[in-house]
Amino acid sequence: MSGAAGNKSRIALIGFGEVGTLFAKELIASGRHSVSTYDILFESAQGNELKDKARGLKAEPCPSASAASKDALVVISAVTATSARDAAEQAGGYLKPGQFFLDINSVSPETKRADEQAVARSGAAYVEAAVMAPVAPYGIKVLLGGKRAGELAALLNPSGMKMRAVSEQVGQASAIKMCRSVFIKGIEALAVEGFLAARRYGVEDRVIASLDETFPSLNWENQAGYLISRVMQHGRRRAAEMRAKFS
């Protein structure tokens, strides 16, 4: 399928938050795709501002998810973790055979498998995605799972993506990310609690010096700031994702 933009294939983004915006920038910059998008916040008080942001990136804001997905080769679900199931259920009603549904939401493997069943009734191909490291300028590193995961990776990687199919079984990619997240978020939680306590007692510099002696390659002064800043920046979203994964 291709949209109105000549030979460019259309990509639809359902959800235009932090991750959706990253994907839009990458896909549009490649010059290979036109991008349409819908976000539930388009209907809110901040809707005009968000739609202007989309237009500024040369993405087309649409009045509904089904409108954004019309004629799209790939429909990317990038909503909040708590809305992922609803988005998949709705997509099962408007997607068509020949389309891909790429579920990049950070939810449990069980939720991804339920999403697959919801989309299957439409005849579209479901592919799960686990976004591992959206780091500019090196592309968005993504693990894929599903019977047509390899096909979708081959389609989108020329557009600057760093996608890798890890399994034909839906749930494996999400399981990798979920287990990795246990380590990453645990380390960050230890850093926040440890360094804030050290600062409270006025021994932060001595604690950092001691850590540098034990782990000399890690540069704990820089690591402390980095780990704490990640918690401050992403804490609310991560809390919602963790509730969704273990509910």
Where does each model-flagged region fall?
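Rossmann-fold dinucleotide-binding core
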Residues: 107-185
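Helical "substrate-binding/catalytic lid" subdomain
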Residues: 176-247
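Short glycine-aspartate micro-motif
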Residues: 11-13, 101, 126, 143
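Rossmann-fold NAD(P) dinucleotide-binding segment
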Residues: 66-126
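A generic structural signal for well-ordered alpha-helical segments
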Residues: 27-28, 54-55, 119, 156, ...
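Conserved beta-strand segments of alpha/beta enzyme cores
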Residues: 34, 60, 100, 125, ...
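NAD(P)+-binding Rossmann beta1-loop-alpha1 motif at the extreme N-terminus of oxidoreductases
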Residues: 1-70, 98
